[in-house]
């Protein structure tokens, strides 16, 4: 064996030192078993790591050089994605105009501290499904418990956060892009039992029994009809869909929404500069020019021109009753608008006659799905956000709010019996939370599937913090017609 040079010893020492610093950071001393292999790569060279370089067959050398490069790249990407940063593309308009559809984000894992993966055996760059093959991109065994490596800080109020979708633990594959499993199950159950029940006249226990009936019926409907709903899958925390929203409530806060304004502990919080709501906009007769909509920043997907006569009754109820000489209603658009966009349109008296905010009946069912309330997306709560170590008294009124935290996120067994609440077989009326939770909402308040619909975000679901937009593409434009939004390149996220 050829004696190692001084340079090789120095390289080996630096590599081992950096690796030990990494192990100290992630607090995983199992990784020490790798140290002898690092030593062998630089010094002893007992293992023929580059055996293919000595092959006399040029094809073998060529193929193996590519394999070597690809494996190295995949391993590097794997560790960078887990511990440093990952790329994320904005898929929906829920955070417009703060973040736009087509924005590509640099998401820092260091901001809140990276998580050790729940499913360590997975393919890099694939969240849960391998493209083309349409199979799982991860192996379910082994599964590691939640552990977060120290980072630069914690989630703060008004931070934009990337996280795993909490209600994405169970998915009906054919509906995974539109409706979470639980909302789908309750909706199908209510459709099956179509006779309306006056919940106001029932006790909380009776209401719970009705909600359980809806959910069980809907769940059976989904499981028994895979052709319609697709296969039903369970996903570990780190393999659930990535969502991005703004944190508007921290652990221990009491949150309430009053007329669209978020209140924390009774005080209004600062609204994002580009807060949006949906409106019905009626013109004085002509259509709104496409150039004007483009200049306002309203995408084609968010622009709906209402021409179906079936809408007329609803439009008249909203006071959108301006008609032309032939007696036909003037054109009405359904648009998401910021205050600035609202003022711009309303100020154009020659074109715009009326603007009315979208009524509440256009919203879906609020969280918790199994609690009868009169909450809606603009008037919600109050609701207390769980904090690690905090103890609450459980009642019939608040159990549906915190039941999912207790069972799905913190792994307990909960039963409601005639004589009370049982957790892990023991009767109790208290529970102490093991994790912190957050309340996430989109800036596009009427076009955002957020905590108002599916509840709290547990700390173990937090992925990272978007730092910068490194690329932004407008899907409504061509490459030679402004597809690249140059003014958004390398724009800081706030």
Which residues are covered by each model-predicted region?
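Extended hydrophobic leader/signal-anchor segments used for secretion and membrane insertion
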Residues: 1-494
């Amino acid at each position: 064996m050829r004696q190692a040079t001084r340079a090789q010893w120095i390289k080996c020492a630096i590599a081992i030192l950096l690796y030990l610093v990494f192990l100290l950071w992630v607090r995983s001393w199992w990784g020490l078993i790798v140290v002898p292999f690092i030593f062998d790569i630089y010094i002893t060279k007992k293992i023929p790591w580059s055996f293919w370089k000595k092959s006399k067959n040029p094809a073998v050398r060529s193929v193996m050089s590519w394999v070597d490069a690809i494996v190295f790249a995949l391993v590097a990407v794997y560790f960078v994605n887990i511990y440093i940063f990952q790329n994320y593309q904005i898929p929906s308009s829920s955070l417009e105009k703060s973040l736009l559809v087509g924005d590509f984000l640099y998401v820092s894992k260091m901001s809140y501290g990276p998580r050790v993966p729940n499913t360590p055996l997975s393919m890099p760059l694939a969240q849960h499904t391998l493209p083309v093959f349409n199979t799982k991109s991860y192996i379910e065994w082994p599964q590691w418990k939640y552990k977060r490596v120290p980072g630069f800080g914690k989630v703060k109020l008004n931070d934009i956060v990337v996280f795993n979708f909490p209600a994405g633990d169970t998915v009906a594959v054919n509906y995974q892009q539109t409706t979470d499993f639980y909302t789908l199950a309750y909706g199908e159950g209510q459709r099956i039992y179509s006779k309306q029940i006056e919940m106001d006249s029932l006790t909380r226990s009776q209401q719970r029994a009705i909600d359980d009936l809806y959910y069980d019926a809907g769940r059976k409907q989904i499981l028994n009809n895979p052709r319609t709903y697709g296969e039903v899958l369970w996903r570990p925390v780190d393999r659930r869909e990535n969502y991005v929203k703004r944190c508007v409530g921290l652990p221990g806060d009491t949150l309430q929404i009053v007329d669209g304004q978020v209140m924390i502990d009774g005080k209004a919080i600062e609204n994002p500069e580009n807060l949006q709501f949906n409106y019905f906009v009626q013109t004085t007769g002509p259509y709104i020019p496409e150039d004007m909509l483009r200049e306002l920043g309203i995408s084609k997907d968010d622009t709906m021109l209402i021409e179906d006569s079936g809408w007329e009754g609803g439009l008249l109820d909203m006071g959108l009753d301006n008609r032309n000489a032939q007696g036909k209603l003037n054109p009405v658009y359904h648009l998401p608008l910021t205050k600035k966009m609202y003022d711009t349109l309303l100020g154009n008296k020659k074109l715009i006659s009326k603007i009315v905010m979208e009524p509440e009946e256009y919203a879906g069912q609020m969280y918790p799905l199994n609690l009868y309330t009169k909450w809606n997306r603009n008037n919600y709560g109050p609701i207390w956000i769980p904090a690690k170590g905090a103890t609450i008294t459980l009642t019939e009124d608040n159990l549906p709010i915190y039941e999912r935290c207790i069972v799905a996120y913190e792994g307990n067994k909960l039963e409601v019996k005639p004589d009370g609440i049982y957790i892990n077989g023991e009767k109790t009326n208290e529970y102490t939370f093991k994790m912190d939770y957050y309340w996430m909402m989109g800036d596009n308040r009427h076009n955002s599937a957020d905590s108002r619909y599916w509840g709290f975000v547990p700390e173990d679901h937090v992925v990272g913090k978007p730092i910068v937009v490194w690329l932004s593409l407008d899907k409504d434009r061509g490459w030679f017609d402004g597809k690249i939004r140059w003014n958004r390149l390398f724009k800081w996220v706030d």
